[in-house]
């Protein structure tokens, strides 16, 4: 601990008076009762936290390596990092201490840009941006410019290209367009050229509606073989916006009209069913495009956004965020923003009855959003405007499958459906209350206030992939996804690590089978335990991998929790 910080903490100790938790009218914790494992952390605002070095034991070697390689500042420890983030986005000492406790006990984890940049001058704490290109050269150039700035400051980007005319349509008197693909290819090159701080290269996704005349070429855009290599964008992600009308056409095996975005004129027709099969084939073979059922999304947007005439046209890099973009009724261009963090469902039994927990995290996210609005540069003006107007945040989850395995509940069971609903109903109730409480305390977001709604956040929850933070949280299962394998080698930017399912390990220990030989057979069997004859069928069902599960169960579980994602 440096000399200046030590002096500041000594001063804080000498001047300290026990705080009263205004929410519960109880005396606050004794921050300055220290032992061999604890010491004080204080930030530049004077927010003081008692940190516990023994909580490093909550982290796995893989989690520590991930934090060390990508998130720790100079001379910063794991607990220092957690305290830095908690103190920077806390309302006061008591809030900061609770936030630190939540993070260090792995109850929740801020999104990676918050971990990396919160409380520093390295970059911004926002991880998610959505925008759209207008059908003009200025609009395209403006999107490129904005995306360069967003990627350079750590953002993942989702851009809508459906406003642009397709290849061969008229420009002016005699000109013809070259279509959207060449412009997307330039975006591909620009994004790859920009580094997101020290964490990763720039990354972006492009979205197109299913009735755009270039949809067939767009679907194949990331295939390395076939077609013109000059009309490929191999590094971008891409998604297709599927309408209800298209799905009806698929069901009835009808022709599907591909229309000009400029005037709605039909450019060509294709078999809806063949186009759907082509889309699904590309998805099976390459993992993309993403599929967004856009009419379903727009039926579920907040009522105040419907009244304002706003619609969702696109999603983000990871396709879990759906927010309005483009020109609003005030003539301003919106680049949607959502700041993310995720609750750890694996620890659900520890925090489910804590009345402060979800509210504290929502306050944390509100403070993160305010930090972005106050400190983002002028190049982010459209994003700052959108964030100010709608104040959308995305409180997500991770560890759902790990929670099932911890409780020995097969994912393909009635009990998994019961817990799924119960968990997300509980979270929804608490985030809704927090949004209303914060609206009373700090004011409703302008979008909601204009129509008389008392909501601090237009959107409150979102299920992010949590690829990195699930590793930090002890290797819990990512997002709401099932575990891919019970034993495997995980390759990341931090290196390669052998990962073994801890709950399966506990079961094998009880059976006297926790040996390298057993784990070797699991690894060679693609992470499955189906071949282990000493396990019961129910035990095998609990530890089914993602590839062994009936995918209809995943669809059913998603459908059950969707009403509670807002």
Language model features by range: what are they?
Residues 1-566:
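Extended catalytic cores of very large enzyme megasubunits
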């Amino acid at each position: 601990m440096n000399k200046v910080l030590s002096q500041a903490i000594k001063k804080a100790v000498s001047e300290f008076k026990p705080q009263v938790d205004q929410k519960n009218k109880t005396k606050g914790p004794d921050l300055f009762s220290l032992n061999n494992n604890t010491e004080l952390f204080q930030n530049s605002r004077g927010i003081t936290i008692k940190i516990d070095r023994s909580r490093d034991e909550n982290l796995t070697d893989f989690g520590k390596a991930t934090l060390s390689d990508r998130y720790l500042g100079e001379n910063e420890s794991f607990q220092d990092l957690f305290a830095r983030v908690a103190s920077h986005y806390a309302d006061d000492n008591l809030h900061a201490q609770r936030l630190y406790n939540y993070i260090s006990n792995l109850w929740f984890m801020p999104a990676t840009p918050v971990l990396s940049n919160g409380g520093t001058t390295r970059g911004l704490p926002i991880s998610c941006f959505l925008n759209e290109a207008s059908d003009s050269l200025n609009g395209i150039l403006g999107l490129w410019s904005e995306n360069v700035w967003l990627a350079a400051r750590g953002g993942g980007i989702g851009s809508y290209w459906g406003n642009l005319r397709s290849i061969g349509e008229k420009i002016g008197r005699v000109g013809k367009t070259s279509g959207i693909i060449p412009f997307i290819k330039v975006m591909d090159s620009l994004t790859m050229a920009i580094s997101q701080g020290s964490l990763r290269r720039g990354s972006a996704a492009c979205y197109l509606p299913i009735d755009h005349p270039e949809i067939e070429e767009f679907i194949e855009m990331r295939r390395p073989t076939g077609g013109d290599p000059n009309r490929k964008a191999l590094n971008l992600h891409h998604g297709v916006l599927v309408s209800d009308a298209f799905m009806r056409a698929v069901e009835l095996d009808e022709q599907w009209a591909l229309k000009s975005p400029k005037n709605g004129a039909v450019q060509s027709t294709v078999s809806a069913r063949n186009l759907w099969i082509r889309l699904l084939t590309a998805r099976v073979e390459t993992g993309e495009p993403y599929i967004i059922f856009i009419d379903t999304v727009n039926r579920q947007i907040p009522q105040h956004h419907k009244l304002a005439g706003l619609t969702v046209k696109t999603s983000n890099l990871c396709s879990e965020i759906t927010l309005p973009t483009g020109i609003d009724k005030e003539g301003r261009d919106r680049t949607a923003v959502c700041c993310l963090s995720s609750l750890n469902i694996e620890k659900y039994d520890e925090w489910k009855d804590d009345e402060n927990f979800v509210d504290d995290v929502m306050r944390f996210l509100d403070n993160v959003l305010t930090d972005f609005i106050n400190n983002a540069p002028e190049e982010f003006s459209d994003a700052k405007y959108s964030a100010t107007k709608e104040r959308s945040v995305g409180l997500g989850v991770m560890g759902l499958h790990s929670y099932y395995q911890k409780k020995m509940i097969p994912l393909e069971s009635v009990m998994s459906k019961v817990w799924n609903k119960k968990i997300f109903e509980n979270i929804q109730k608490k985030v809704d209350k927090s949004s209303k409480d914060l609206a009373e305390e700090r004011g409703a977001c302008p979008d909601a206030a204009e129509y008389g709604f008392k909501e601090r956040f237009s959107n409150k929850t979102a299920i992010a992939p949590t690829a990195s933070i699930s590793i930090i949280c002890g290797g819990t299962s990512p997002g709401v996804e099932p575990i891919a394998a019970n034993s495997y080698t995980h390759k990341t930017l931090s290196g390669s690590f052998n990962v073994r399912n801890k709950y399966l390990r506990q079961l094998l220990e009880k059976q006297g089978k926790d040996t390298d030989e057993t784990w070797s057979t699991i690894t060679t069997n693609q992470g499955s335990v189906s071949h282990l004859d000493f396990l019961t069928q129910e035990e095998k069902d609990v530890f089914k991998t993602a590839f062994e599960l009936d995918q209809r169960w995943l669809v059913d579980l998603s459908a059950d929790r969707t009403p509670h994602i807002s």
